[in-house]
Structure formats: structure tokens, C-alpha cells
Amino acid sequence: MQSITFTRPDDWHLHVRDGAALAAVVPHTAERFGRALIMPNLRPPVTTTAQALAYRDRIRAAVPAGLAFEPLMSLYLTDNTAPDEIERARASGAVIAAKLYPAGATTNSDAGVTAIDKIYPVLERMEACGLVLCVHGEVTGGEVDVFDRERVFMEKILSPLVRRFPALKVVFEHITTAEAAQFVRAAGANVAATVTAHHLLLNRNAIFAGGIRPHHYCLPVLKRETHRVALVEAVTSGNPRFFLGTDSAPHARSTKEAACGCAGCYTAHAGIELYAEVFDAAGALERLEAFASLNGPAFYGLAPNADKITLVRESWSVPAGFPYLDDDPLVPLRAGESVGWRLA
């Protein structure tokens, strides 16, 4: 197969930052995707519906003319989130999810939830009104090995949460392990997961190939090859509760190539093409459309996009960097290397 045409995909987990950084990265996503669920971990975080609507306006202003891209918004949950804010979010029609960040788990998560029981009233309201809970599934205690954070989170927090709120729609974001994939398969229809392209393409050896590779450092961290293989099997299986979420996370080069570098891989420049590589290598290109374009909208109760895109089997070279901040470029995944599929 030399080309594939399918329903325009959506990105169900995206970071676009704000200000000049936002203007630099939004076009990459808008060229490929019809919609994206925007993560709320700005500094300060997006904790109210009013803030989310203002942020949506700033994103819309950065969409190039002629592209019909729609940002879908989320709220950042804190220990102090009010249940009434959930009602406002749901009523807005623009905010479709709220994000649980365990405090300290990832970039700009220091304002996150310190104990899950502190947000039980909020989760009850979300369950009642149908707002989706998106979860960064890692514990943060120093006694837990960084490669075990996802597994321990499932055992201590996610499993009890799903039992306590059986009608709450939950997305286990950017899963990285065979155990997480199995958790989703075994759960009810109200539990789904996003999977990133980099966790499907890379294992943890990529962080240390010939030296420290800061542009392969993300959270949750890359895992063993056995887990990567299990994730590929999950996304190509046809199970409708796995769908595309790039977790594309832009950082200036100086903050990645540093003594204490930021976590995140930037993939929006090839946000659908990298997934095509994965499905092609697995002999499952015919299942890419469901994963990228159909499963996510179905879970969120939305219609698929009306238009289509075409990918061509044609190699292209990824630039060494993209303009980002003044004299501080953005280094994308595969910088200086090639991608095997191209957006027509």
C-alpha cells in the first residue's frame, strides 16, 4: 500500500503551551488533526471554565487561515476544585474533560492533587454530569522506582477509583506498560487509554543510546521492549478503547539539553505520520483509522470529523529544529532523521 486515505484524526492528549510557544506549535497540529484535547498544565494552571475559554481563544488565534482546527478544553484538578466548577465546565460545551495530575508527577504538576480522596466530591459530580476524567497514571513517592510508578498507581489509586465510581468515564493517559493495556482491556466500557507514538516506537534503551538522549526523555518514562510490543499489540488489536493521544510536549532546546532537563517529546510535526509507521510495521494499516479517527470521538460522545486526509509512503527529512523561543529552538523527535510516511 503506497497511500492511505481515511477520516481526519484527532489528538486526544496535546500540550501547546502559551504565548510565543503556542504560536510556534499549533500549526503543526492544525495541519493534521481536526481536533485536539488541550492539556491544562500551564503556569498557572487552567483551573476554571473561564480560564479554559480564554485559553481556547488564544489557541484559535494561532490556527493558520484555511485550517478548520478546533481545540477541545480540559480543566486542571486541584485539592480545591469546586464541584460547581465541574457543572460550569460541562455546561460550557467547550470543556469536555478534567485532568488528574498527582502533585509532582510531571511538568507543571506541583499544583496537582495531593490525595485522591480530596477530590471525591468533584469525581461524584463528574460521574453524574458525564465529564470525562483524564488521568496521569503515576505515583510520585520517592520510595517507588521510576519504572514502576504506573503499575503502583494502578494498584493503589486507579483500581479503587474505578470501583468507587463505576459510571465515571476515565481515560488512562499515555499508558506505557503491558499491565496498563491489560487493565484497560479488563475494565468496563467507561475506561479507555491514549497511547503516544514515542511509546510505540521507542523503548528505554533509546534514552541511553551512545550517551544520554534528552530528547527521548518523557514522563511516563519509556519502558522495556516487552512493554512497547504489548502497546503495539493493544493499539492494533481493534479494541475501541485505545485511541491516539500524542502527548506532544514542546520544550526549548536549552531546557531539554540541561543538567536537569525537562520531560517531554515533541511529535506534533509528524503527529499522524509516526503512528502510520507503527501500524505499517505491524501489518495493520487498515486499523489506523479506527485508532486515530473513530475510537476517541466515540468515547467522548462526539461525531468523527467529516473530512479525510491522505498519507503517502514517502520518506522525508525532519529538520534539526523548529523556531520556538528567541534563539532557543524546539528539537523534534527524529530531528535530522527521516519519517517514512508523509501527509499529502
UniProtKB/Swiss-Prot annotation:
Pathway: Pyrimidine metabolism; UMP biosynthesis via de novo pathway; (S)-dihydroorotate from bicarbonate: step 3/3. One of its GO terms (molecular function) is dihydroorotase activity. Keywords: Hydrolase, Metal-binding, Pyrimidine biosynthesis, Zinc. GO terms for biological process: 'de novo' pyrimidine nucleobase biosynthetic process; 'de novo' UMP biosynthetic process. Zn(2+) 1 binds at H13, H15, K99, D247. Zn(2+) 2 binds at K99, H136, H174. PROSITE patterns: DIHYDROOROTASE_1, DIHYDROOROTASE_2. Its EC number is 3.5.2.3. The active site is at D247. The keyword Zinc applies. The modification N6-carboxylysine is found at K99. It is an enzyme of class 3 (hydrolase). Its cofactor is Zn(2+). InterPro entries: Amidohydro-rel, DHOdimr, Dihydroorotase_CS, Metal_Hydrolase. Substrate binds at H15, V16, R17, N41, H136, L219, H251, A263. It catalyses: (S)-dihydroorotate + H2O = N-carbamoyl-L-aspartate + H(+). Binds 2 Zn(2+) ions per subunit. GO terms for cellular component: cytosol. Pfam families: Amidohydro_2. PANTHER family: DIHYDROOROTASE. Catalyzes the reversible cyclization of carbamoyl aspartate to dihydroorotate. Belongs to the metallo-dependent hydrolases superfamily. DHOase family. Class II DHOase subfamily. Homodimer. This is Dihydroorotase. The lineage of its organism: Bacteria, Pseudomonadati, Pseudomonadota, Betaproteobacteria, Rhodocyclales.
